[in-house]
């Protein structure tokens, strides 16, 4: 899902400047994280609308009698809703993966800071 992001090809010198200003690709991680949150919100809204639609149709069926085609259609809609729930679960799994990356990054960053401080101390 995050691979759907398409970036324009930039000249090499712009890429070098960008790489120097963000060597750990934090900006890309932030964009991907925001996109993932957007997709989760979008899926939640879609599930909410589908659920409301199914409930309204069920109410109509109860009021006007049960028809086999309608039942089959509702079963199909329920299956679609379950698929959307599965997709949403995948998005949450991706969030968990991002959390793991962030935790790992924090510990690596602490190590870099410690090494840098030692380097600065040796230069004094």
Curated annotation (Swiss-Prot):
PANTHER family reported for this sequence: BIOGENESIS OF LYSOSOME-RELATED ORGANELLES COMPLEX 1 SUBUNIT CNL1
Chief site of localization = cytoplasm
The disulfide bridges present are none
Which intervals of the chain form a coiled coil? 75-98
Cellular localization per UniProt: Cytoplasm
From the UniProt record, give one GO term of the biological process aspect.
Answer: endosome organization
Give the protein's biological function.
Answer: Component of the biogenesis of lysosome-related organelles complex-1 (BLOC-1), a complex that is involved in endosomal cargo sorting.
**What are the start and end residues of every segment in region (Disordered)?**
1-20
* Species the sequence originates in: Kluyveromyces lactis (strain ATCC 8585 / CBS 2359 / DSM 70799 / NBRC 1267 / NRRL Y-1140 / WM37)
Record's protein name: Biogenesis of lysosome-related organelles complex 1 subunit CNL1
Report the sequence similarity comment from the record: Belongs to the BLOC1S4 family.
**GO (cellular component) term, any one:** BLOC-1 complex
Q: How does it assemble?
A: Component of the biogenesis of lysosome-related organelles complex-1 (BLOC-1).
Q: Supply the alphabetized keyword list.
A: Coiled coil, Cytoplasm, Transport
């Amino acid at each position: 899902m995050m691979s759907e992001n398409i970036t324009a090809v930039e000249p090499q010198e712009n890429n070098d400047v960008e790489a120097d200003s963000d060597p750990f690709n934090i900006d890309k991680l932030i964009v991907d994280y925001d996109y993932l949150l957007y997709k989760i919100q979008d899926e939640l809204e879609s599930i909410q609308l589908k659920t409301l639609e199914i409930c309204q149709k069920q109410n109509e069926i109860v009021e006007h009698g049960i028809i086999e085609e309608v039942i089959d259609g509702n079963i199909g809609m329920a299956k679609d809703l379950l698929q959307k729930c599965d997709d949403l679960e995948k998005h949450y799994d991706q969030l968990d993966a991002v959390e793991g990356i962030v935790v790992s990054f924090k510990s690596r960053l602490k190590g870099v800071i410690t090494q840098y401080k030692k380097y600065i101390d040796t230069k004094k």
